[in-house]
Amino acid sequence: MTAILITGYRSFEIGIFDHKDPRVSIIKQAIRKDLIGYLENGVDWFIFTGNLGFEQWALEVANELKEEYPLQIATIFLFETHGDKWNEKNQEVLSQFRAVDFVKYYFPNYEQPTQFSQYYQFLLEKTEGAYVFYDTENETNLKYFLKKAKDMPHYQLLLLTFDRLNDMS
C-alpha cells in the first residue's frame, strides 16, 4: 500500500471564494496531471484532512479518477467537530469528504495545542509522501507541516507552486 497525503491552501488563503473562479479549473488541471502521475507510479490511497479549497478540488479530481484507476480515498479529520459551523454550501463539501472509502477522526475535540503536532506526526507516519499546494512566497501554518516532512528521510514531497501553475496556464 502506498498512501499520499493531499493538502494545501484553503480557498480563502488564496482569495478564491467562488467555485466558478477560472483559477479553479487551472488548479484542477494541475491536480489531475499530478494525481495520474502518482497512480501510474503505484499510489493506491489518497489521504485528505477535509479542508475547503485545494483539498476540495483534489477530492473532486480523485473521485473522477476512480472511474479509471483502482484507488482508495480516506479523510482523516483532526477533530470530530470539523466543519460543524460551516454554512450549508460548505456542509455539502464536508459530506463529500465523509463519503469516501475510509473516515477517521483523530481527536474527539480540541483540548490543547499539542494536538496539532500529534496529528501532523500521525499523518507523516501513515503516508509515504505528500502532495501540497504551497508556495513559500505566501506562507501559512502549512509551513510547520512542511518543515516536519522535509526532516523525515525518504518522505516524498511534491509541491504545486504558483510558478508551476503559471507554466500550465
From Swiss-Prot:
Tell me where the signal peptide lies: none
Gene3D superfamilies found in the cross-reference section: 3.40.50.450
Q: What is this protein called?
A: UPF0398 protein Spy49_1277c
The text of the family note is: Belongs to the UPF0398 family.
HAMAP family recorded? UPF0398
Question: Which Pfam family, giving just one, matches this sequence?
Answer: YpsA
